[in-house]
A protein has these predicted regions:
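Flexible, polar/low-complexity N-terminal or interdomain linker segments that lie immediately upstream
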Residues: 42, 81-137, 141-149
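N-terminal helix-turn-helix DNA-binding core of bacterial DNA-binding proteins
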Residues: 15-54, 78-83
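Positively charged, proline/Ser/Thr-rich regional signature most characteristic
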Residues: 126-184, 190
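Beta-hairpin "wing" of winged helix-turn-helix
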Residues: 65-74, 81
Length: 218
């Protein structure tokens, strides 16, 4: 009887360890954070992470073996996406636990914020209030495919790499909220600084669309 119980327990923990293996690599966590934003091809993930196609495919296979991602063949490309919404919750839970339990994570956040002069960080609560005002413009800095997948209501899409060339088209009589992929992305702060340096009243919302949706009704 004891042996049956032990085998049962060991089999379950062995299965769960596959999830642990998926999360044991910083690059696999980065891939998951990217896929939270929307489905992507292997080539797109490779470009975003700076890894070779071969390394990207290897990491994706491990994530697929752990059932954290699924894939679909579309023409000449293989497209990957998060397996289900629980995985999205898991990614953000991991980020939140890291921020709370690891002093290094908070130090990195603080040092980066301190290094970015002329930024106006805002909380989600402040952003919700500002979004209700007609004089506020929300800019989503993510690539177009991620914006098309999901975005904050009434936000416009100006990918970070195109922001500087579009500055002349932005209204200076409105407050501007910029957001990107969340707390592990530097673009919101950098975009806020760029806009403020050019005479705008810009605010950095260092939160993701997921954070916006999850917290807006609380």
């Amino acid at each position: 009887m004891d042996k049956i119980c032990e085998n049962y327990k060991n089999s379950l923990y062995s299965g769960l360890s596959k999830i642990g293996k998926c999360l044991s690599s910083e690059k696999r966590i980065e891939i998951l954070d990217l896929l939270v934003q929307g489905a992507k091809t292997v080539e797109s993930i490779s470009n975003e992470t700076g890894m070779s196609i071969a390394n990207t495919s290897r990491h994706l296979q491990i994530l697929k073996d752990g059932n954290l991602v699924i894939s679909e063949k579309k023409g000449n490309y293989v497209v990957y996406e998060i397996a289900n919404t629980q995985i999205i919750d898991l990614v953000y839970l991991l980020i939140g636990v890291g921020e709370k339990q690891l002093a290094d994570i908070q130090r990195i956040h603080n040092e980066f914020n301190d290094s970015c002069m002329k930024i106006r960080p805002i909380t989600l609560e402040q952003a919700y209030e500002m979004a209700e005002q007609n004089e506020t413009l929300i800019i989503d800095l993510r690539p177009e495919d991620e914006f098309n997948s999901s975005h904050i209501e009434n936000a416009i899409n100006i990918p970070m790499k195109h922001l500087e060339e579009n500055i002349k088209n932005l209204p200076k009589d409105k407050k501007i909220i910029v957001y990107c992929r969340g707390r592990n992305c530097a673009y919101a702060n950098l975009a806020s600084k760029l806009l403020n340096d050019n005479g705008f009243q810009a605010y950095s919302l260092n939160q993701s669309y997921y954070d916006w949706q999850k917290n807006k009704n609380f």
